[in-house]
C-alpha cells in the first residue's frame, strides 16, 4: 500500500531553492549520487568484515550508471547496504540534517551549489536535472521499497516485493526536457572522470557498441521467419532440391549490430599506492575532491609512506576553507579515511588524529592492522597510536612547508589559526613546534602579523619579557591604556584578539627563554634607572593618602588602589591578579551558557585600581582630598573614574544606569543647569552632587 509523507519544512525549502533557482554547474548531481553510492558500499563492506553472510549473492560491490534515451531517464544503481523503509522516510524527507539550513544560508550568501555534498544533503541535487526522482532500495533487514517524489512538498513510499534488486539502491532520474545532455555517453564519461575517478568501487557505465557482422542469406531467412511468426504473411517460394541448393555458393553480407554492455570507467589504482613523483597536481586535486566533497583544490598536499617495523602509506590534504561545522561537538569527524591493505575500514576514526587536526583530510592505508578490527579495539591498538603520532608529525611538516609561502600561510592561518591554538592547549608534546606557527598583530607590525621568533629578534636591549594584551579587536587594543608605558619605552606589544588566545596563554609561560607578561594583570615591572626608582617611591608616598581615600570610597569593589607603573596618558586603569582572569577572559566566561557560577566568583578576583600621578585629574583629586577629605564631590568623581576605568580596561559595567546618571549630572553642570529633581538621582553607590549648584559647578569645572 502506497503511503504519502510531507517533506520536513527545511528540506522543502531547500528543494524549492534548487528547483526554482538557476545554477550553471548542474553537473555536480552525478558526483553526489555516486559519492552516496560509494558510502553505501563502504557500509556493507565494513559489516562484511565481521559477518561475510551480509553480502549474500551480491558479493561484487559496484556502482552502475545507465542512460535510457528512449524513456529519458538516467539511473544510478549500487550494490551497497540499501535502505529500510524507515531509513527511506527519514533520510529522504522527514528529518532535516544539521547542514540543511547551513547550506541554504551559504547559498543565499553567494555560495556555490557544488558545496552541497559538504552539508550532507547531496541527494537533493538530483532535482537540478530531474523533475521526478524514483528511489528503489533493498536492505538485508527489510523488503524492497520505492520512494518517489516530484518535489511538490510530498513523497510516496510503496512496498516493491517483485523488485529485482537483491541488495542496494537504484535511483532513477526522470530528466527535464532541457537536461537530455546527461544521457549522452561522452558527457557521462567526462563527468565520471572529472569528479569520481578515484572512487574505491567500480563505476560501470552502460555504453553502446556497434560491430559489423557478416550474415548469410540463411540468417536473413531466419530473421524473416521470425518476423513471420510475429504475424507477417510468409512468402511462397519454390522448393528446390537440396543437392542443387548446396551447389550454389552461399551469399553473405555485412550488417551493423548495436549491443549494450557495462564498461568500468575508473581503472586507476589507488593514488596513495603510487610513487609521489608519478602523481600530478591535477590527480591529487581530483582525488581530494573525490574523498572530501570539496569543490576547490586543496591548499597543500603531503604524500608519504612509513616503512620498517610498521608500514603504512598516507596522503594528507589541507583544504582552502574551514568546514562550517568544524568545532561542533556533536559532529562526527570523517576527515581521514582508514584502509587496511587497500580495503576501506572506516571514515570517522576519531583515534587516527587529534581533535585540533580535524580539518585535515586524507587517507591512511595500513599494512599491519587486522582487517576485522572494531572501533573498540582501535582505541587500545598500539599500531594505531604509532600511525597517529606519525600523522601529527607529518601534518606539522606540512604546515611548516605552507609557512614558507607568506600568502599561502596567510590563507591557512585565517582559516585554521584556531586549530593551531587548540593544538597548543591540548598537545603538550608538540607545543613548542606549534608555537612557531603562531601569528599575531602587534604594536609594530601594522597590517601584517608577526611570529614569536621575529618578535624576540626585535626585542629592545634590557627587555626581559614578551609583552601582550588580550581583547576584542586590534583597533581597541591599539588605543588601550595598558600599553601606554610599554610603547613609550619602545617595547613591542602583541595583540591577542581571539577568545582561544586566553586558553593558549594559560598553557605557555615562555618562548625561547623569554617569559610572557600580560599587561592587563598585576606583576608587570619595567626596568628603571635609579632616578626613576627614586621618583616612583616619592610618588607612592605623596599619593598614599589619595589611594586610601579612593579605596574607602570604592570599598570592596577593588582590592586596593596603587600608583601605576604602566600608565602614561590615562588617569587610571583596573588590573586583575596575576593568576586570575583578565577582563577579556571575564567577558568570555560571562557569555558561556553553561558557566559555573562558583568558579566564576573564584576566578573573577577583586581588581586593583592603578592611578597615574602625572595626570591632571589625579593631581586635582589629590589636592581636594588633602584640602578636605570629606569633600562631597570627590566621592562622585571617584565613582565616575572607576566606572570609566572599567570600560577602558575592558570590563562590563555592573550598573550602567548609575554611570549614565553621573554622566548626565556632569553634562548639567557643564551647561550650568540647576538640578531640579534630586529624587531621580541614584542613592548608591554615588553620593548626590553638593546642594550648592554654584560651588558644585565650580568644583567640576576645575576638574575638567
Swiss-Prot record:
InterPro entries registered for this protein in UniProt: HATPase_C_sf (IPR036890), Heat_shock_protein_90_CS (IPR019805), HSP90_C (IPR037196), Hsp90_fam (IPR001404), Hsp90_N (IPR020575), Ribosomal_Su5_D2-typ_SF (IPR020568)
Give one Pfam family: HSP90
Q: Write down any Gene Ontology CC term.
A: cytoplasm
Q: Does the keyword ATP-binding apply?
A: yes
Q: Where is this region: Disordered?
A: 212-251, 675-704
Q: Which residues bind ATP?
A: 36, 78, 123, 375
| A molecular-function term among this protein's GO annotations | ATP binding
Q: For bias kind Basic and acidic residues, which ranges apply?
A: 227-238
Report the function annotation for this chain: Molecular chaperone that promotes the maturation, structural maintenance and proper regulation of specific target proteins involved for instance in cell cycle control and signal transduction. Undergoes a functional cycle that is linked to its ATPase activity. This cycle probably induces conformational changes in the client proteins, thereby causing their activation. Interacts dynamically with various co-chaperones that modulate its substrate recognition, ATPase cycle and chaperone function.
Q: Summarize subunit and interaction data from the UniProt record for this chain.
A: Homodimer.
Listed name of the protein: Heat shock-like 85 kDa protein
Amino acid at each position: 500500500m502506497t503511503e504519502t509523507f510531507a517533506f520536513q519544512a527545511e528540506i522543502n525549502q531547500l528543494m524549492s531553492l534548487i528547483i526554482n533557482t538557476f545554477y550553471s554547474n548542474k553537473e555536480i548531481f552525478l558526483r553526489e549520487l555516486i559519492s552516496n553510492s560509494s558510502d553505501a558500499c563502504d557500509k556493507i563492506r565494513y559489516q562484511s568484515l565481521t559477518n561475510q553472510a551480509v553480502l549474500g549473492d551480491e558479493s561484487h560491490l559496484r556502482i552502475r550508471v545507465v542512460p535510457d534515451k528512449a524513456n529519458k531517464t538516467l539511473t544510478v544503481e549500487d550494490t551497497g547496504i540499501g535502505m529500510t523503509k524507515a531509513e527511506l522516510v527519514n533520510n529522504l524527507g522527514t528529518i532535516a540534517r544539521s547542514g540543511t539550513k547551513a547550506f541554504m544560508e551559504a547559498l543565499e550568501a553567494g555560495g556555490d551549489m557544488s558545496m552541497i555534498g559538504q552539508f550532507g544533503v547531496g541527494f537533493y541535487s538530483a532535482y537540478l536535472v530531474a523533475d521526478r526522482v524514483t528511489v528503489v532500495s533493498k536492505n538485508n533487514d527489510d523488503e524492497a521499497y520505492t520512494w518517489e517524489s516530484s518535489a511538490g512538498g510530498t513523497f510516496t513510499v510503496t512496498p516493491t516485493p517483485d523488485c529485482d534488486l537483491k541488495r542496494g539502491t537504484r535511483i532513477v532520474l526522470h530528466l527535464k526536457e532541457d537536461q537530455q545532455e546527461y544521457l549522452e555517453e561522452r558527457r557521462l564519461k567526462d563527468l565520471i572522470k572529472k569528479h569520481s575517478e578515484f572512487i574505491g568501487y567500480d563505476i560501470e557505465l552502460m555504453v553502446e557498441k556497434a560491430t559489423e557482422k557478416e550474415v548469410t542469406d540463411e540468417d536473413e531467412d531466419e530473421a524473416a521467419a521470425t518476423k513471420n511468426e510475429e504475424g507477417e504473411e510468409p512468402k511462397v517460394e519454390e522448393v528446390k532440391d537440396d543437392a542443387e541448393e548446396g551447389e550454389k555458393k552461399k551469399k553473405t553480407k555485412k550488417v551493423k549490430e548495436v549491443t549494450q554492455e557495462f564498461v568500468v570507467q575508473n581503472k586507476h589504482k589507488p593514488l596513495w599506492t603510487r610513487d609521489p613523483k608519478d602523481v600530478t597536481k591535477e590527480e591529487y586535486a581530483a582525488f581530494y575532491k573525490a574523498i572530501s566533497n570539496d569543490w576547490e583544490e586543496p591548499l597543500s598536499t603531503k604524500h608519504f609512506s612509513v616503512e620498517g617495523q610498521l608500514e603504512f602509506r598516507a596522503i594528507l590534504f589541507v583544504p582552502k576553507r574551514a568546514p562550517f561545522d568544524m568545532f561542533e561537538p556533536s559532529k562526527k569527524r570523517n576527515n581521514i579515511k582508514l584502509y587496511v591493505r587497500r580495503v576501506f575500514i572506516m571514515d570517522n576514526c576519531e583515534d587516527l588524529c587529534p581533535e585540533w587536526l580535524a580539518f585535515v583530510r586524507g587517507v591512511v592505508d595500513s599494512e599491519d592492522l587486522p582487517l576485522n578490527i572494531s572501533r573498540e579495539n582501535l582505541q587500545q591498538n598500539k599500531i594505531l597510536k604509532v600511525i597517529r603520532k606519525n600523522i601529527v608529525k607529518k601534518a606539522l611538516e606540512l604546515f611548516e612547508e605552507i609557512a614558507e609561502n607568506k600568502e599561502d600561510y596567510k590563507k591557512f592561518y585565517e582559516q585554521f589559526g584556531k586549530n593551531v591554538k587548540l593544538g597548543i592547549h591540548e598537545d603538550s608534546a608538540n607545543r613548542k613546534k606549534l608555537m612557531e606557527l603562531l601569528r599575531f598583530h602587534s604594536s609594530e607590525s601594522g597590517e601584517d602579523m608577526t611570529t614569536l621568533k621575529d618578535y624576540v629578534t626585535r626585542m629592545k636591549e634590557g627587555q626581559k619579557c614578551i609583552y601582550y594584551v588580550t581583547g576584542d579587536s586590534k583597533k581597541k587594543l591599539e588605543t588601550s591604556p595598558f600599553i601606554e608605558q610599554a610603547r613609550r619605552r619602545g617595547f613591542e606589544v602583541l595583540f591577542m584578539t581571539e577568545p582561544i588566545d586566553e586558553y593558549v596563554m594559560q598553557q605557555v609561560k615562555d618562548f625561547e627563554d623569554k617569559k610572557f607578561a600580560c599587561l592587563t594583570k598585576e606583576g608587570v615591572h619595567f626596568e628603571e634607572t635609579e632616578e626613576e626608582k627614586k621618583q616612583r617611591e616619592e610618588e607612592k608616598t605623596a599619593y598614599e593618602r589619595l589611594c586610601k581615600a579612593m579605596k574607602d570610597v570604592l570599598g570592596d569593589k577593588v582590592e586596593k588602589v596603587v600608583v601605576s607603573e604602566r600608565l602614561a596618558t590615562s588617569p587610571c586603569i583596573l588590573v586583575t591578579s596575576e593568576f586570575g582572569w583578565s577582563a577579556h577572559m571575564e567577558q568570555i566566561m560571562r557569555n558561556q551558557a553553561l558557566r559555573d557560577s562558583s568558579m566564576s566568583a573564584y576566578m573573577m578576583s577583586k581588581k586593583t585600581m592603578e592611578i597615574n600621578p602625572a595626570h591632571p585629574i589625579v593631581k586635582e583629586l589629590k589636592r581636594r582630598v588633602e584640602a578636605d577629605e570629606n569633600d562631597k564631590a570627590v566621592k562622585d568623581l571617584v565613582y565616575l573614574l572607576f566606572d570609566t576605568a572599567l570600560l577602558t580596561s575592558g570590563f562590563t559595567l555592573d550598573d550602567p544606569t548609575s554611570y549614565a546618571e553621573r554622566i548626565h549630572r556632569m553634562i548639567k553642570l557643564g551647561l550650568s543647569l540647576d538640578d531640579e529633581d534630586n529624587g531621580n538621582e541614584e542613592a548608591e553607590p554615588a553620593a548626590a552632587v553638593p546642594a550648592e549648584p554654584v560651588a558644585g559647578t565650580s568644583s567640576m569645572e576645575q576638574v575638567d
